[in-house]
Amino acid sequence: MFDIGFTELTLIFIIGLVVLGPERLPTVARTLGHWIGRARSTLNHLKSELERETITQDMQERMEKQMRQMGLDEDSIREAKDSLLSPEQIARSRTPRDKPLSAALNNDESPSDKDSADKNNHDQDSRRHD
């Protein structure tokens, strides 16, 4: 990154040893390493965010190009979306007389059930008379 060779690093170490002394040099080196690590982490995060943003922008441009080729624009999509009913609108549009299917099945017998019940009663009555 900085293209620092071994000789430059040795020179920096000797100057640091003379200026800071042998007691404070390890602490300063540790702190400096910590801050360099944080700076690298921040730069890597920034780099990944920029790459992600570039990819997102590229995908957005591709999608818009495909929509233009298909003859779709944002207004027609928005109109189609607005024409669809939301679940809340569907629930509000139901009248109280509309019953759920399970309630209708539990409370009312179907006509075929009534017919079969009448037929069974008629068969039992005819057997009693015989």
Swiss-Prot record:
Q: What is this protein called?
A: Sec-independent protein translocase protein TatB
For this protein, the record's InterPro entries field holds: TatA/B/E, TatB
Where does this one sit in the cell?
A: Cell inner membrane
**Compositional bias of kind Basic and acidic residues:** 57-67, 111-130
Task: Please provide the Gene Ontology terms (biological process) for this protein.
Answer: protein transport by the Tat complex
Zinc among keywords: no
Question: Region Disordered: which residues?
Answer: 57-130
GO cellular component terms listed in the entry, alphabetical order: TAT protein transport complex
Q: Report the protein's function.
A: Part of the twin-arginine translocation (Tat) system that transports large folded proteins containing a characteristic twin-arginine motif in their signal peptide across membranes. Together with TatC, TatB is part of a receptor directly interacting with Tat signal peptides. TatB may form an oligomeric binding site that transiently accommodates folded Tat precursor proteins before their translocation.
**Tell me, how does this one assemble?**
The Tat system comprises two distinct complexes: a TatABC complex, containing multiple copies of TatA, TatB and TatC subunits, and a separate TatA complex, containing only TatA subunits. Substrates initially bind to the TatABC complex, which probably triggers association of the separate TatA complex to form the active translocon.
**HAMAP family xref list:** TatB (MF_00237)
- Name the residues that span the membrane: 1-21
As for family, the record states:
Belongs to the TatB family.
Query: What membrane topology does the UniProt entry give?
Result: Single-pass membrane protein
Which superkingdom, per the lineage?
Bacteria
Q: Does the keyword Glycoprotein apply?
A: no
One GO molecular-function entry: protein transmembrane transporter activity
